[in-house]
UniProtKB/Swiss-Prot annotation:
Expressed in seedlings. Its EC number is 2.7.11.1. The modification Phosphoserine is found at S154. GO terms for cellular component: cytosol; nucleus. Keywords: ATP-binding, Kinase, Nucleotide-binding, Phosphoprotein, Serine/threonine-protein kinase, Transferase. The active site is at D123 (proton acceptor). The keyword Plastid does not apply. It comes from Arabidopsis thaliana. GO terms for molecular function: ATP binding; kinase activity; phosphatidic acid binding; protein kinase activity; protein serine kinase activity; protein serine/threonine kinase activity. This is Serine/threonine-protein kinase SRK2B.
Length: 361
């Protein structure tokens, strides 16, 4: 960790804390995601790191390295200065059709690459799509904590993901094609960009999970009258929001759809993208899989001394104590978020119990 210096805290989530760090020698900024050593270091963490390491594409956040500290495992990755796509939509309310298409084209490009690498994301959402700091922002997919690789694992069975983005077959709790579930989530992302609301939530009762799930299973959505979009766009959404995943449009066919192809940037064309699909392409990370797995195994051993994330000793100085207090507050917030998520999981189970076994026709 000596090669990095702390710049600022940039967020907290169920995983732990994220910080903006600077490489001392090169002055390069990186995002560092910290996960506490011990029981939190499970197969999901290992899978996220190994899957992320294998990906090399301009629409995917670059993995750099994993580092072990006395208290945490730290995952260093590319820093996206433009923040979340979610924040951009919150500021704008909703996007024009052209702007939504611009970001959707990049999203599909990144997801298509993941699928070609036999990795399905399983938690695609606006909060997991970041933007770089350029004037015409480049979209970057991040957070591979739930992703599954068909090269390493069996078919996904667990119900993961954010409620509003979950495909019907995932709610059915049987085996499902993770790639087709990703297509559904991409459709939800497109809808939110166009409308500024989630397609299957009751706007007057958004926290009613039972109603949301019923609407997802019935594919009950509509484009509000105040949103004016082309017939091609409506057609694409209707091909994505299909209950039976076998009849849903594939990523390959989305890339051939007239709406997708309109104003497609040259770097996203099939010819330009071919360069990223070469098997001999090196990864961004110099760490081998063996080195990474060794660090992950070590991280399963809890820290001997309980120490806040602010006590890592970067930057020191007069404000170190204040930073430690801030970090402790962040950890408390994370714990609260985890409690909320646990509550949601309970609610989903209750919904399933009240609805009986949900089936996809």
């Amino acid at each position: 960790m000596d090669k990095y210096e702390l710049v600022k805290d940039i967020g907290a989530g169920n995983f732990g804390v994220a910080r903006l760090m600077r490489v001392k020698n090169s002055k390069e900024l990186v995002a560092m995601k910290y996960i506490e050593r011990g029981p939190k270091i499970d197969e999901n963490v290992a899978r996220e790191i190994i899957n992320h390491r294998s990906l090399r594409h301009p629409n995917i956040i670059r993995f750099k390295e994993v580092v072990l500290t006395p208290t945490h495992i730290a995952i260093a990755m590319e820093y996206a200065a433009g923040g979340e796509l979610f924040e951009r939509i919150c500021s704008a309310g909703r996007f024009s059709e052209d702007e939504a298409r611009y970001f959707f084209q990049q999203l599909i490009s990144g997801v298509s690459y993941c699928h070609a690498m036999q990795i399905c994301h399983r938690d695609l959402k606006l909060e997991n799509t970041l933007l770089d700091g350029s004037p015409a922002p480049r979209l970057k997919i991040c957070d591979f904590g739930y992703s599954k690789s068909s090269l390493l694992h069996s078919m996904p069975k667990s119900t993961v993901g954010t409620p509003a983005y979950i495909a019907p077959e995932v709610l059915s709790r049987g085996e499902y094609d993770g790639k087709m579930a990703d297509v559904w989530s991409c459709g939800v992302t497109l809808y939110v960009m166009l409308v500024g609301a989630y397609p299957f939530e009751d706007q007057e009762d958004p926290k009613n999970f039972k109603k949301t799930i019923q609407r997802i299973m019935a594919v009950k959505y509509k484009i509000p009258d105040y949103v004016h979009i082309s017939q091609d766009c409506k057609h694409l959404l209707s091909r994505i929001f299909v209950t039976n995943s076998n009849k849903r449009i594939t990523i390959g066919d989305i890339k051939k759809h007239p709406w997708f192809l309109k104003n497609l940037p040259r770097e996203l064309t099939e010819i330009a993208q071919a360069a990223y699909f070469r098997k001999e392409n090196p990864t961004f990370s110099l760490q081998s899989v063996e080195e990474i797995m060794k660090i992950v195994e070590e991280a399963k051993t809890p820290a001997r001394v309980s120490r806040s994330i602010g006590a890592f000793g970067w930057g020191g100085g007069e404000d170190a104590e204040g930073k430690e207090e801030d970090a402790e507050e962040e950890v408390e917030e994370v714990e609260e978020e985890e409690d909320e998520e646990d509550e949601y999981d309970k609610t989903v189970k209750q919904v399933h119990a009240s609805m009986g076994e949900v089936r996809v026709s």
